[in-house]
Every structure is written in C-alpha cells, then in structure tokens.
Amino acid sequence: MNLSVDIAGVTMKNPVTTGSGTFGSGEEFSEFVDLSKLGAVTTKGVANVPWPGNPVPRVAEVYGGMLNAIGLQNPGIDVFVERDIPYLKKAGATIIVNVCGKSENCLLYTSDAADDSLRV
C-alpha cells in the first residue's frame, strides 16, 4: 500500500510527522522511534543565533495536562546544521525545519542556511 504524500513539494513516504517542539531535533527520540519510518521529522524551532529560552518555571501542571513555555530554546542554525541535520540525514529521515526569528532578515538567513545544508 502506497501511503506517500506530497506537501508543498516535499514528498513523504507517509503522512505521519512529528510535532515541532515536542520531538526535539529527532535524536532525542531515536531510541524509541525509527526515524526512517516517519513521513518526516519536524524539528523544534531554530533561529539564526542561539536562544536561551524562557526562565524557569517553564512547565505548569493543569487539570487534564500541562502547559509549557520553553521559549524556543535552541542552539542556533550553525550548530543545528553541523550537528542535527547530518544526524537526521544519516538516520534516513525526511526533514522539515521549523525556523524562528525576530525579523524577516533573521528568518531568511536561517531558512537559507537550513536549505543549503539539506541540498548538499
């Protein structure tokens, strides 16, 4: 059975993808999930520069669940391109990078850097 889908020019072997921010950058869950079997790994947000995220507390229990406000903590695109993308490629994952930034220029820089590393 062919479950492949094409979304905005990205072909995935199936429609199952991870939620950005809940799956880190993939390596954190690779012990539990074969990343190559997913339709795609959607990474946590990554910016042009490292972001420390919000101060603690970042998580609060509420009736029926929890709330979190991590604040887009990330190592920045340079570390992401050097460390995370090669890991995901080696694992056979289709990669969707969630970019974040404080300006249009930041978003463009981060998107271009991610795009360049994915096309190598």
Which residues does each predicted region cover?
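N-terminal capping/small domains of soluble enzymes
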Residues: 1-94
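Gly/Pro- and small hydrophobic-enriched strand-loop and loop-to-helix capping segments
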Residues: 120
